[in-house]
Swiss-Prot record:
This is ATP synthase gamma chain. InterPro entries: ATP_synth_F1_ATPase_gsu, ATP_synth_F1_gsu, ATP_synth_F1_gsu_CS. One of its GO terms (biological process) is proton motive force-driven plasma membrane ATP synthesis. PANTHER family: ATP SYNTHASE GAMMA CHAIN, ATP SYNTHASE SUBUNIT GAMMA, MITOCHONDRIAL. Produces ATP from ADP in the presence of a proton gradient across the membrane. The gamma chain is believed to be important in regulating ATPase activity and the flow of protons through the CF(0) complex. Disulfide bonds: none annotated. Belongs to the ATPase gamma chain family. It is found in: Cell inner membrane. The lineage of its organism: Bacteria, Pseudomonadati, Chlorobiota, Chlorobiia, Chlorobiales. GO terms for molecular function: ATP binding; proton-transporting ATP synthase activity, rotational mechanism. Pfam families: ATP-synt. Keywords: ATP synthesis, Cell inner membrane, Cell membrane, CF(1), Hydrogen ion transport, Ion transport, Membrane, Transport.
Protein backbone atom coordinates (compact mmCIF):
# COMPACT_ATOMS: atom_id res chain seq x y z
CA UNK A 1 0.00 0.00 0.00
CA UNK A 2 1.45 3.43 -0.94
CA UNK A 3 2.49 5.68 1.91
CA UNK A 4 1.14 9.18 2.53
CA UNK A 5 4.37 10.60 1.13
CA UNK A 6 4.03 8.54 -2.08
CA UNK A 7 0.45 9.72 -2.60
CA UNK A 8 1.39 13.37 -1.93
CA UNK A 9 4.20 13.18 -4.51
CA UNK A 10 1.86 11.62 -7.09
CA UNK A 11 -0.85 14.19 -6.38
CA UNK A 12 1.62 16.99 -6.90
CA UNK A 13 2.75 15.49 -10.21
CA UNK A 14 -0.80 15.00 -11.51
CA UNK A 15 -1.81 18.54 -10.54
CA UNK A 16 1.25 19.92 -12.31
CA UNK A 17 0.42 17.89 -15.43
CA UNK A 18 -3.19 19.08 -15.29
CA UNK A 19 -2.03 22.70 -15.34
CA UNK A 20 0.09 21.99 -18.42
CA UNK A 21 -2.69 20.19 -20.32
CA UNK A 22 -5.18 22.91 -19.43
CA UNK A 23 -2.81 25.59 -20.73
CA UNK A 24 -2.15 23.58 -23.92
CA UNK A 25 -5.89 23.21 -24.46
CA UNK A 26 -6.34 26.99 -24.25
CA UNK A 27 -3.44 27.61 -26.65
CA UNK A 28 -4.80 25.01 -29.10
CA UNK A 29 -8.26 26.61 -28.93
CA UNK A 30 -6.80 30.02 -29.82
CA UNK A 31 -4.75 28.53 -32.68
CA UNK A 32 -7.77 26.57 -33.89
CA UNK A 33 -9.84 29.70 -34.37
CA UNK A 34 -7.16 31.24 -36.57
CA UNK A 35 -6.44 28.00 -38.45
CA UNK A 36 -10.14 27.34 -39.02
CA UNK A 37 -10.68 30.82 -40.43
CA UNK A 38 -7.76 30.41 -42.85
CA UNK A 39 -8.93 26.98 -44.00
CA UNK A 40 -12.50 28.14 -44.58
CA UNK A 41 -11.34 31.26 -46.44
CA UNK A 42 -9.17 29.17 -48.79
CA UNK A 43 -11.99 26.84 -49.85
CA UNK A 44 -13.97 29.19 -52.15
CA UNK A 45 -10.87 30.24 -54.13
CA UNK A 46 -9.64 26.66 -54.53
CA UNK A 47 -13.14 25.54 -55.47
CA UNK A 48 -13.56 28.28 -58.08
CA UNK A 49 -10.23 27.43 -59.71
CA UNK A 50 -11.30 23.80 -59.93
CA UNK A 51 -14.64 24.85 -61.39
CA UNK A 52 -12.94 27.00 -64.03
CA UNK A 53 -10.65 24.14 -65.03
CA UNK A 54 -13.66 21.84 -65.28
CA UNK A 55 -15.36 24.34 -67.56
CA UNK A 56 -12.27 24.85 -69.70
CA UNK A 57 -11.72 21.11 -70.05
CA UNK A 58 -14.93 20.88 -72.08
CA UNK A 59 -13.52 23.34 -74.63
CA UNK A 60 -10.16 21.72 -75.36
CA UNK A 61 -8.53 18.34 -75.58
CA UNK A 62 -6.71 17.36 -72.38
CA UNK A 63 -3.55 16.71 -74.42
CA UNK A 64 -2.99 20.49 -74.65
CA UNK A 65 -1.41 20.35 -71.19
CA UNK A 66 0.64 17.36 -70.01
CA UNK A 67 -0.57 17.80 -66.41
CA UNK A 68 -4.11 17.10 -67.62
CA UNK A 69 -3.17 14.01 -69.62
CA UNK A 70 -3.48 10.65 -67.83
CA UNK A 71 -0.81 8.03 -68.56
CA UNK A 72 -1.76 4.84 -70.36
CA UNK A 73 0.01 2.80 -67.69
CA UNK A 74 0.67 3.71 -64.06
CA UNK A 75 4.03 2.25 -63.09
CA UNK A 76 5.14 4.81 -60.53
CA UNK A 77 3.07 6.65 -57.93
CA UNK A 78 3.97 9.61 -55.74
CA UNK A 79 2.19 9.80 -52.37
CA UNK A 80 2.22 13.22 -50.69
CA UNK A 81 1.53 12.73 -46.99
CA UNK A 82 0.67 15.65 -44.71
CA UNK A 83 1.18 15.18 -40.97
CA UNK A 84 1.97 17.51 -38.07
CA UNK A 85 5.33 18.63 -36.71
CA UNK A 86 4.36 18.06 -33.08
CA UNK A 87 2.65 15.37 -31.06
CA UNK A 88 0.14 15.51 -28.20
CA UNK A 89 -2.75 15.61 -30.66
CA UNK A 90 -4.44 12.27 -30.04
CA UNK A 91 -4.63 9.91 -33.00
CA UNK A 92 -4.17 12.69 -35.57
CA UNK A 93 -0.83 11.44 -36.91
CA UNK A 94 -1.27 7.73 -36.19
CA UNK A 95 -4.54 7.56 -38.15
CA UNK A 96 -3.29 9.38 -41.25
CA UNK A 97 -0.03 7.38 -41.26
CA UNK A 98 -2.03 4.13 -41.09
CA UNK A 99 -4.14 5.34 -43.99
CA UNK A 100 -1.02 6.07 -46.06
CA UNK A 101 0.35 2.63 -45.23
CA UNK A 102 -2.92 0.97 -46.28
CA UNK A 103 -2.85 2.91 -49.55
CA UNK A 104 0.72 1.83 -50.28
CA UNK A 105 0.45 -1.80 -49.14
CA UNK A 106 -3.04 -2.54 -50.43
CA UNK A 107 -4.02 -0.36 -53.40
CA UNK A 108 -0.45 0.02 -54.69
CA UNK A 109 1.00 -3.21 -53.26
CA UNK A 110 2.25 -4.49 -56.64
CA UNK A 111 3.95 -1.19 -57.45
CA UNK A 112 5.45 -0.95 -53.96
CA UNK A 113 6.95 -4.43 -54.30
CA UNK A 114 8.78 -3.23 -57.43
CA UNK A 115 9.89 0.05 -55.85
CA UNK A 116 7.30 2.03 -57.77
CA UNK A 117 5.95 4.05 -54.84
CA UNK A 118 7.69 7.27 -53.82
CA UNK A 119 6.72 9.64 -51.02
CA UNK A 120 6.89 13.31 -50.16
CA UNK A 121 6.30 13.93 -46.46
CA UNK A 122 5.18 17.33 -45.20
CA UNK A 123 5.50 17.44 -41.42
CA UNK A 124 8.03 16.04 -38.96
CA UNK A 125 5.97 13.09 -37.68
CA UNK A 126 5.38 11.53 -41.09
CA UNK A 127 8.96 12.20 -42.17
CA UNK A 128 10.42 10.46 -39.12
CA UNK A 129 8.06 7.48 -39.35
CA UNK A 130 8.62 6.62 -43.02
CA UNK A 131 12.31 7.52 -43.10
CA UNK A 132 13.05 5.15 -40.19
CA UNK A 133 11.25 2.33 -42.00
CA UNK A 134 13.17 2.73 -45.23
CA UNK A 135 10.43 4.07 -47.50
CA UNK A 136 11.51 5.83 -50.67
CA UNK A 137 11.33 9.59 -50.01
CA UNK A 138 11.70 12.01 -52.91
CA UNK A 139 11.59 14.97 -50.51
CA UNK A 140 10.76 15.74 -46.91
CA UNK A 141 9.62 18.94 -45.24
CA UNK A 142 9.98 18.53 -41.46
CA UNK A 143 9.08 21.65 -39.53
CA UNK A 144 6.95 23.03 -42.37
CA UNK A 145 4.10 23.89 -39.99
CA UNK A 146 6.35 25.88 -37.65
CA UNK A 147 6.09 28.77 -40.09
CA UNK A 148 3.34 27.78 -42.51
CA UNK A 149 3.41 29.80 -45.72
CA UNK A 150 2.14 29.65 -49.29
CA UNK A 151 5.75 29.33 -50.49
CA UNK A 152 5.99 25.94 -48.75
CA UNK A 153 2.90 24.68 -50.58
CA UNK A 154 4.23 26.02 -53.88
CA UNK A 155 7.57 24.27 -53.34
CA UNK A 156 5.86 20.91 -52.80
CA UNK A 157 3.56 21.46 -55.80
CA UNK A 158 6.55 22.36 -58.01
CA UNK A 159 8.41 19.23 -56.91
CA UNK A 160 5.41 17.01 -57.69
CA UNK A 161 4.84 18.71 -61.07
CA UNK A 162 8.48 18.26 -62.13
CA UNK A 163 8.41 14.59 -61.17
CA UNK A 164 5.22 14.06 -63.18
CA UNK A 165 6.41 16.00 -66.24
CA UNK A 166 9.76 14.18 -66.29
CA UNK A 167 7.97 10.82 -66.30
CA UNK A 168 9.45 9.88 -62.94
CA UNK A 169 5.91 9.26 -61.64
CA UNK A 170 2.62 8.59 -63.43
CA UNK A 171 0.22 9.62 -60.68
CA UNK A 172 0.33 11.89 -57.63
CA UNK A 173 -1.94 11.23 -54.64
CA UNK A 174 -2.55 13.41 -51.58
CA UNK A 175 -3.15 11.90 -48.12
CA UNK A 176 -4.21 14.33 -45.41
CA UNK A 177 -6.63 15.23 -42.61
CA UNK A 178 -9.46 17.46 -43.77
CA UNK A 179 -11.00 19.74 -41.16
CA UNK A 180 -14.71 19.11 -40.66
CA UNK A 181 -15.32 19.87 -37.00
CA UNK A 182 -13.58 19.62 -33.65
CA UNK A 183 -14.96 16.13 -33.03
CA UNK A 184 -14.99 14.81 -36.59
CA UNK A 185 -11.67 14.85 -38.50
CA UNK A 186 -11.91 13.46 -42.00
CA UNK A 187 -9.11 11.31 -43.45
CA UNK A 188 -8.80 12.03 -47.16
CA UNK A 189 -7.01 10.71 -50.21
CA UNK A 190 -7.37 12.53 -53.52
CA UNK A 191 -5.55 12.55 -56.82
CA UNK A 192 -3.50 15.67 -57.51
CA UNK A 193 -1.97 14.65 -60.85
CA UNK A 194 -3.00 14.15 -63.53
CA UNK A 195 -5.62 16.83 -62.93
CA UNK A 196 -9.10 15.41 -63.48
CA UNK A 197 -11.53 18.33 -63.20
CA UNK A 198 -15.06 17.27 -62.38
CA UNK A 199 -18.27 19.09 -63.00
CA UNK A 200 -17.38 20.47 -66.43
CA UNK A 201 -20.46 21.04 -68.54
CA UNK A 202 -20.39 22.21 -72.13
CA UNK A 203 -23.61 24.21 -71.77
CA UNK A 204 -22.48 26.16 -68.70
CA UNK A 205 -19.00 26.56 -70.20
CA UNK A 206 -20.34 28.32 -73.28
CA UNK A 207 -23.00 30.37 -71.49
CA UNK A 208 -21.06 31.60 -68.47
CA UNK A 209 -17.56 32.30 -69.81
CA UNK A 210 -15.87 34.04 -72.71
CA UNK A 211 -12.25 32.95 -73.09
CA UNK A 212 -9.47 35.32 -74.18
CA UNK A 213 -6.98 34.76 -75.68
CA UNK A 214 -7.92 31.04 -75.84
CA UNK A 215 -8.98 28.20 -73.53
CA UNK A 216 -5.63 26.44 -74.04
CA UNK A 217 -3.62 29.53 -73.07
CA UNK A 218 -5.77 30.08 -69.99
CA UNK A 219 -5.36 26.44 -68.96
CA UNK A 220 -1.58 26.81 -69.13
CA UNK A 221 -1.86 29.74 -66.69
CA UNK A 222 -4.45 28.15 -64.42
CA UNK A 223 -2.90 24.72 -63.94
CA UNK A 224 0.12 25.85 -61.85
CA UNK A 225 -2.13 28.15 -59.81
CA UNK A 226 -4.56 25.29 -59.27
CA UNK A 227 -1.82 22.94 -58.02
CA UNK A 228 -0.34 25.57 -55.69
CA UNK A 229 -3.77 26.45 -54.34
CA UNK A 230 -4.79 22.83 -53.78
CA UNK A 231 -1.59 22.12 -51.82
CA UNK A 232 -2.11 25.30 -49.80
CA UNK A 233 -5.72 24.35 -49.06
CA UNK A 234 -4.68 20.85 -47.98
CA UNK A 235 -2.01 22.21 -45.62
CA UNK A 236 -4.45 24.70 -44.10
CA UNK A 237 -7.05 21.96 -43.65
CA UNK A 238 -4.48 19.70 -41.99
CA UNK A 239 -3.29 22.50 -39.70
CA UNK A 240 -6.84 23.25 -38.56
CA UNK A 241 -7.56 19.54 -38.02
CA UNK A 242 -4.34 19.22 -36.00
CA UNK A 243 -5.28 22.07 -33.65
CA UNK A 244 -8.78 20.61 -33.23
CA UNK A 245 -7.30 17.19 -32.41
CA UNK A 246 -4.84 18.71 -29.94
CA UNK A 247 -7.56 20.72 -28.20
CA UNK A 248 -9.72 17.61 -27.85
CA UNK A 249 -6.77 15.52 -26.62
CA UNK A 250 -5.76 18.11 -24.02
CA UNK A 251 -9.36 18.49 -22.87
CA UNK A 252 -9.57 14.72 -22.38
CA UNK A 253 -6.22 14.69 -20.56
CA UNK A 254 -7.35 17.51 -18.27
CA UNK A 255 -10.57 15.67 -17.40
CA UNK A 256 -8.65 12.44 -16.79
CA UNK A 257 -6.26 14.30 -14.49
CA UNK A 258 -9.23 15.74 -12.62
CA UNK A 259 -10.64 12.25 -12.06
CA UNK A 260 -7.25 10.89 -11.03
CA UNK A 261 -6.84 13.73 -8.51
CA UNK A 262 -10.23 12.82 -7.04
CA UNK A 263 -9.23 9.16 -6.70
CA UNK A 264 -5.84 10.07 -5.21
CA UNK A 265 -7.47 12.40 -2.68
CA UNK A 266 -9.72 9.55 -1.55
CA UNK A 267 -6.70 7.24 -1.27
CA UNK A 268 -4.79 9.92 0.64
CA UNK A 269 -7.64 10.44 3.12
CA UNK A 270 -8.00 6.69 3.63
CA UNK A 271 -4.27 6.28 4.18
CA UNK A 272 -4.22 9.24 6.56
CA UNK A 273 -7.20 7.84 8.47
CA UNK A 274 -5.53 4.43 8.67
CA UNK A 275 -2.32 6.03 9.97
CA UNK A 276 -4.23 7.98 12.65
CA UNK A 277 -6.16 4.86 13.67
CA UNK A 278 -2.93 2.92 13.91
CA UNK A 279 -1.31 5.61 16.07
CA UNK A 280 -4.34 5.74 18.38
CA UNK A 281 -4.31 1.95 18.68
CA UNK A 282 -0.63 2.05 19.61
CA UNK A 283 -1.24 4.78 22.22
CA UNK A 284 -4.14 2.83 23.77
CA UNK A 285 -2.10 -0.37 23.76
CA UNK A 286 0.79 1.46 25.42
CA UNK A 287 -1.48 2.95 28.08
CA UNK A 288 -2.97 -0.49 28.83
CA UNK A 289 0.51 -1.91 29.15
CA UNK A 290 1.49 0.77 31.67
CA UNK A 291 -1.63 0.08 33.78
CA UNK A 292 -0.72 -3.54 34.00
Amino acid sequence: MPTLKDIRIRLKGVKSTQQVTKAMKMVAAAKLRRAQDRAIQARPYAGKLKEMLASLSTKVDTSVNPLLSPREEVNNVLVILVTSDRGLCGGFNANIIKMAQRLIHEEYAALHAKGGVTMICAGTKGTEFFRKRGYKLAAAYPGVFQNLSFDSAREIADKASKMYLSGEVDRVVLVYNEFKSVLAPNLRTEQLLPITPEGGDAKTASSEYLYEPSPAAIIDELVPKHLNTQLWRVMLESNAAEQAARMAAMDSATENAKELIRVLNISYNRARQAAITKELSEIVAGADALKQ
